[in-house]
């Protein structure tokens, strides 16, 4: 259809006048007269410092980035709800679990662990699975991964482990020579390495992976009874991962595949769901395990689980930075009825995660909408950068005081725990570094075993030091002889040397 020039001009004119334009302003609210040209000294003169609009735009642009998370930098989030499947008040007084059908709002952030913000989501890595429950008792963060165990059992090794897995300070490239050098001194990592080098280390979708709390926690009921629990999110979408050839194919097509898939599914109303299960052990039953039940490198074998609720993610963030990037998760964000166990890795995470969020977002991070509790916050924490809280306590910013009745509630005191022994600095008892890696390997079908060997060999064959390679293969041999023998063949490692190391 041919349209006249005058018709086009009239149409464009009508369209432009129909918009209710708002006046562009500076941050102080003052209107901007020209956003296209800087103020200069004459036609060809220098730009003037008095151009405050230009200066402010450049200043704000230079400050758009906040510190990147040291781990879990690349992530995506979604809002949703958790619905309890029963009344579990016999086990815990935690609000989400005390009434069948109770609805608790949640925000979930999925992430890669080691790689940086702009990295491909196809890279092999554990995946973070962090859930913030907004309860009437405060915010509870269940900060986990898509794999049930971790590389180390003591938080004192966490900085070293992350340093080895991060890019080299010389080349700025991740290097298997570095992280296998570290892991050759950490046989406890054998179990986790078997998990992460399986195809579960390259999930096809955030929707098609499970989540685990990794650590044991304590559930406490109204009577003060204590049980140890482990949490697992089971995907109602099933488990789907990328095989080695599909990883390369996907990276060539879409290295944002995890984010794009989640956004597309929720955007079209295909809301993903996960059932939350818990394994429960009494302190007595925990002590009778033939491994240390508080060891983050272990799963609780043959312990039955029970479903406690279902989570549905049904709303996407309106702004990535305000919601997903500024969301702050920490295992120390606990509510009544849930306490940390004595797990040595968890004990360190209680401090480290909260501290890194203070560094990244500042002391008033809980005033950010995505981190703000539904309950009123009543304490005497004050001031700091970007504090916009309306304090109503007047002159009283301390406790106790006769002027203000803001007191503790004894019913929420920490549970008492009996301690025996002496202050010490020793490794845990019953480490059993290799046993569960063997159980995992033998549970795999042949295709999954072959992919595991191929994935591991792909990185081990980049290791120059043959002693490091042989040591690593010996760990997998100790887990399962077939496992180690196949890996020795795939890495051209002398099997006799492997067997000798396995006997050491």
From Swiss-Prot:
EC class of the enzyme, as a word: oxidoreductase
Catalysed reactions listed for this entry: 2 H2O2 = O2 + 2 H2O
Keyword Oxidoreductase on entry: yes
Pfam families: Catalase, Catalase-rel
SMART domains: Catalase (SM01060)
EC number: 1.11.1.6
Stored InterPro entries: Catalase, Catalase_AS, Catalase_clade1/3, Catalase_core, Catalase_haem_BS, Catalase_immune_responsive, Catalase_sf
UniProt entry keywords in alphabetical sequence: Heme, Hydrogen peroxide, Iron, Metal-binding, Oxidoreductase, Periplasm, Peroxidase, Signal
Subcellular location: Periplasm
Signal peptide: 1-21
GO molecular function: catalase activity; heme binding; metal ion binding
Keyword flag Zinc: no
GO biological process: hydrogen peroxide catabolic process; response to hydrogen peroxide
GO CC field: cytoplasm; periplasmic space
Cofactor names: heme
Residues at the catalytic site: 72, 145
Amino-acid positions noted as binding heme in the UniProt annotation, renumbered to this chain: 353
Superkingdom assignment: Bacteria
Entry function: Decomposes hydrogen peroxide into water and oxygen; serves to protect cells from the toxic effects of hydrogen peroxide.
Sequence similarity: Belongs to the catalase family.
PANTHER family: CATALASE, CATALASE-2
Name used for this protein in its record: Catalase
Species assigned in the record: Vibrio parahaemolyticus serotype O3:K6 (strain RIMD 2210633)
Lineage: Bacteria, Pseudomonadati, Pseudomonadota, Gammaproteobacteria, Vibrionales
């Amino acid at each position: 259809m041919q349209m006249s020039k005058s018709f086009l001009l009239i149409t464009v004119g009508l369209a432009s006048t129909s918009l209710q334009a708002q006046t562009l302003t500076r941050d102080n609210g003052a209107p901007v007269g020209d956003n296209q040209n800087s103020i200069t000294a004459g036609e060809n003169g220098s730009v003037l410092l008095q151009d405050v609009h230009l200066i402010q735009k450049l200043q704000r642009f230079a400050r758009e980035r906040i510190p990147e998370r040291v781990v879990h930098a690349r992530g995506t989030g979604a809002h949703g709800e958790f619905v309890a499947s029963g009344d579990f008040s016999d086990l815990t007084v935690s609000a989400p679990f005390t009434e069948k059908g109770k609805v608790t709002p949640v925000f979930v952030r999925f992430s890669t662990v080691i790689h940086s913000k702009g990295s491909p989501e196809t890279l092999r890595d554990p995946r973070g699975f962090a859930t913030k429950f907004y309860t009437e008792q405060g915010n509870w963060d269940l900060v986990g991964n898509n794999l049930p165990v971790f590389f180390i059992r003591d938080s004192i090794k966490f900085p070293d482990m992350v340093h080895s897995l991060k890019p080299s300070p010389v080349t700025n490239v991740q290097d298997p020579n570095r992280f296998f050098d570290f892991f050759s001194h950490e046989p406890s990592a054998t179990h986790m390495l078997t998990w992460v080098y399986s195809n579960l280390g390259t999930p096809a979708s955030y929707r098609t992976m499970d989540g685990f709390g990794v650590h044991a926690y304590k559930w406490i009921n109204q009577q003060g009874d204590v049980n140890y629990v482990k949490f697992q999110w089971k995907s109602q979408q099933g488990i789907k991962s990328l095989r080695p050839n599909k990883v390369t194919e996907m990276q060539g097509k879409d290295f944002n595949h995890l984010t794009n898939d989640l956004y597309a599914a929720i955007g079209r109303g295909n809301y993903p769901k996960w059932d939350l299960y818990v394994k429960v052990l009494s302190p007595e039953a925990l002590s009778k395990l033939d491994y240390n039940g508080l060891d983050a490198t272990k799963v609780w074998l043959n312990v039955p689980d029970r479903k406690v609720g279902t989570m549905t993610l049904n709303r996407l963030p309106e702004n990535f930075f305000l919601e997903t990037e500024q969301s702050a998760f920490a295992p120390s964000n606990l509510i009544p009825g849930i306490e940390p166990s004595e797990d040595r890795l968890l004990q360190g995470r209680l401090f480290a995660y909260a501290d890194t969020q203070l560094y990244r977002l500042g002391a008033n991070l809980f005033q950010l909408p995505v981190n703000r509790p539904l309950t009123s916050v009543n304490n005497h924490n004050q001031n700091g950068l970007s504090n916009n809280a309306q304090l109503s306590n007047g002159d009283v910013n301390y406790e106790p005081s006769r002027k203000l009745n803001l007191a503790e509630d004894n019913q929420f005191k920490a549970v008492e725990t009996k301690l025996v022994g002496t202050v010490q600095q020793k490794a845990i008892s019953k480490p059993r570094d290799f046993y569960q890696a063997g159980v995992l390997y033998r549970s795999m079908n042949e295709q999954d075993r072959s992919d595991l060997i191929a994935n591991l060999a792909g990185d081990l064959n980049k290791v120059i030091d043959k002693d490091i390679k042989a040591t690593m293969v010996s760990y997998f041999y100790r887990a399962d002889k077939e496992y180690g023998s196949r890996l020795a063949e795939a890495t051209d490692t002398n099997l006799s040397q492997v067997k000798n190391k396995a006997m050491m």
